[in-house]
């Protein structure tokens, strides 16, 4: 499929000529093609005569970006640039990563996904349909004899997009956005990645009734046919790209867990919503434990939102508690998990399999007041009874952490750790400024969405964002460098400890996590620790002597390479 290759010396060779060169985003330099390249590649007359540098182009691109009237327009602009000139896109993103990450990734990508069919301009990645299994085979056949050309595949079925639910084929945009972060943060070569949407239909009524919708316009397929679709995808992906890391993104809760369970011990794969969210949350909790001077093993955790993300966080924290010396039984008893029906208890009907280990004994909570909707035990009552030291929100219920709940928690904890993790900002369980005021500046806060610093009593509180981008780029890079056969639980803990080790929580108002602007440094640090752990745990198939150098050598940078005609 590819009509170009990158040589060992770093330059690019291509068989394409003229307008064909300009149509390939990885090759296109626009007016930065040199005179020699213009002549050799047949570009004379197809470009204005002046040759500019990538610095000039980046300056102009930022002016154009800044002129866009709103965040969605900025996303559309960056998408168009990505589809036109990939190197310039990443140069711009690297120059303004903190500013642009919320545009190419959460939260703005959610709006872009909702508008996908109406803003559609150009395909990118693979669109694999459950209604066309032969078409899926044909798509992978296009990569015949190119088994070493792809290091990373991000796939979604788009049933559980961010906090907005089922958005069908438009979910390809989350795969694309995720890969953009991999490249911007960790230098994963953009020519060696692949975005995939697994279109099994949609249950979103607005899409089913939209004549412009470009995906399968029928209800979501479930059961054996869906499972076979996933199995066929994995088999084809592994057969075609045997060394590729398979990243699962934004599947529905039930499928996300079953797919991960089916494959985690067989292929190099992970689910970012479950394991990535868990790892970045563990990093925040490790920082909170250090700041509060209370050992991790002595904390009590309430999780409000017992879905894929919430239980994923619980699992990462619980495994860390076991490694700190608690028994399996003791570790489960450190968690109180709440869903829409209230505190999970073992007498509840319709508990999901992954929720059952975290359900409290009905006898244990018999004296709790059942004042929630439907007779359940609500968050306030759980906080009163459990006296948590850590409160985590993954519910997408805006304002769920009320003043009464927060003050109740703060009345029995010197430094309450409060993590409203839901995205986007409008769905956050609480605002940092309120949490700081209600706790008189004592709260240790980490949020899922970006929030500005808060001034209180002469102290500036910087709010750490528990963005999965702190985890998955470095995890991917470390995995690729070592060509790991699997991704282990130990590799995720290595991510968390590396991230937590990069902040100085002793400074008043310090964030519990590194800044998003420092993602490049964070990702390199995480990659080194992941690689070390992969080698230690015996899943690495390549073991570089100098891991730091190997990680640096593997990182792609957005600079124009010489292009030669062949």
Swiss-Prot record:
The active site is at residues 105, 178. It comes from the Bacteria. Divalent metal cations. The keyword NAD applies. One of its GO terms (biological process) is pyruvate metabolic process. Transmembrane segments: none annotated. GO terms for molecular function: malate dehydrogenase (decarboxylating) (NAD+) activity; malic enzyme activity; metal ion binding; NAD binding; oxaloacetate decarboxylase activity. SUPFAM superfamilies: Aminoacid dehydrogenase-like, N-terminal domain (SSF53223), NAD(P)-binding Rossmann-fold domains (SSF51735). A divalent metal cation binds at residues 249-250, 273. It catalyses: (S)-malate + NAD(+) = pyruvate + CO2 + NADH; oxaloacetate + H(+) = pyruvate + CO2. Keywords: Magnesium, Manganese, Metal-binding, NAD, Oxidoreductase. PROSITE patterns: MALIC_ENZYMES. Pfam families: malic, Malic_M. Induction: Weakly expressed in glucose or malate minimal medium. The keyword Metal-binding applies. Its cofactor is Mg(2+); Mn(2+). Disruption phenotype: Mutant can use either a gluconeogenic carbon source or glucose as efficiently as the wild-type strain. The ATP concentrations in the mutant grown in minimal medium with glucose are similar to the wild-type level. ATP concentrations decrease by about 10% in malate minimal medium. The mleA-maeA-malS triple mutant shows a decrease in ATP concentrations by about 20% and a moderate growth defect. NADPH overproduction is roughly halved in the deletion mutant. Its EC number is 1.1.1.38. NAD(+) binds at residues 306-309, 423, 468. Belongs to the malic enzymes family. Catalyzes the decarboxylation of malate to pyruvate. Can use NAD and NADP, but with a strong preference for NAD. Can also catalyze the decarboxylation of oxaloacetate. Involved in keeping the ATP levels high. PANTHER family: MALIC ENZYME-RELATED, NAD-DEPENDENT MALIC ENZYME, MITOCHONDRIAL. This is NAD-dependent malic enzyme 3. The gene is malS.
């Amino acid at each position: 499929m590819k009509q170009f290759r990158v040589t060992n010396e770093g330059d690019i060779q291509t068989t394409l000529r003229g307008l064909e060169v300009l149509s390939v985003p990885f090759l296109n330099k626009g007016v930065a093609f040199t005179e020699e390249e213009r002549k050799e590649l047949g570009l004379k007359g197809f470009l204005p005569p002046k040759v500019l540098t990538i610095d000039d182009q980046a300056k102009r691109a930022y002016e154009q970006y800044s002129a866009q009237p709103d965040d969605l327009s900025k996303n559309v602009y960056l998408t168009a640039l990505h589809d036109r000139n990939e190197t310039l896109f990443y140069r711009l993103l690297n120059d303004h990563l903190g500013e642009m990450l919320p545009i190419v990734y959460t939260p703005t990508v959610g709006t872009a996904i909702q508008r996908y069919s109406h803003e559609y301009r150009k395909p990118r990645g693979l669109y694999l349909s459950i209604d066309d299994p032969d078409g899926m085979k044909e798509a992978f056949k296009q990569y015949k004899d190119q088994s070493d050309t792809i290091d990373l595949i991000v796939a979604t079925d788009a049933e559980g997009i961010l906090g907005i639910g089922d958005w069908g084929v438009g979910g390809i945009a989350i795969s694309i956005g995720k890969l953009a972060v991999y490249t911007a943060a960790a230098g994963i070569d953009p020519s060696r990645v692949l975005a995939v949407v697994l279109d099994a239909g949609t249950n979103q009524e607005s899409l089913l009734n939209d004549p412009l919708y470009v995906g399968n316009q029928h209800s979501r397929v479930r059961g054996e046919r869906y499972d076979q679709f996933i199995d066929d995808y994995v088999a084809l992906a592994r057969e075609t790209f045997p060394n590729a890391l398979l990243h699962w993104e934004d599947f529905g809760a039930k499928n996300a867990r079953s797919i991960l369970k089916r494959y985690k011990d067989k292929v190099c794969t992970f689910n970012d919503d479950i394991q990535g969210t868990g790892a970045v949350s563990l990093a925040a909790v490790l920082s909170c434990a250090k700041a509060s001077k209370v050992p991790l093993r002595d904390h009590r955790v309430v999780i409000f939102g017992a879905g894929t993300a919430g239980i994923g966080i619980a699992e990462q924290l619980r495994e860390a508690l076991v490694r700190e010396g608690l028994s399996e039984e003791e570790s489960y008893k450190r968690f109180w998990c709440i869903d829409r029906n209230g505190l999970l208890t073992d007498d509840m009907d319709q508990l999901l399999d992954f929720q059952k280990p975290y359900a409290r004994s009905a006898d244990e909570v018999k004296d709790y007041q059942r004042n929630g909707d439907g007779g359940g035990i609500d968050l306030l009552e759980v906080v009163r009874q459990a006296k948590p030291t850590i409160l985590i929100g993954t519910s997408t219920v805006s304002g769920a952490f009320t003043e009464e709940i927060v003050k109740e928690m703060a009345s029995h904890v010197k430094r309450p750790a409060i993590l409203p993790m839901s995205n986007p900002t409008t769905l956050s369980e609480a605002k940092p400024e309120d949490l700081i005021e209600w706790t008189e500046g004592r709260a240790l806060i980490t949020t899922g969405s970006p929030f500005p610093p808060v001034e209180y009593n002469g102290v500036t509180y910087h709010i750490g964002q528990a963005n999965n981008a702190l985890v998955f780029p470095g995890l991917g890079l470390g995995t690729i460098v070592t060509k790991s056969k699997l991704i282990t639980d130990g590799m995720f803990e290595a991510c968390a400890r590396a991230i937590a080790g990069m902040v100085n929580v002793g400074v008043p108002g310090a964030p519990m996590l590194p800044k998003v602007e420092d993602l490049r440094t964070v990702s390199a640090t995480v990659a080194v620790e992941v690689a070390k752990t992969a080698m230690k745990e015996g899943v690495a198939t390549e073991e570089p002597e100098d891991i730091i150098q190997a990680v640096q050598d593997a990182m792609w940078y957005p600079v124009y390479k010489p292009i030669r005609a062949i």
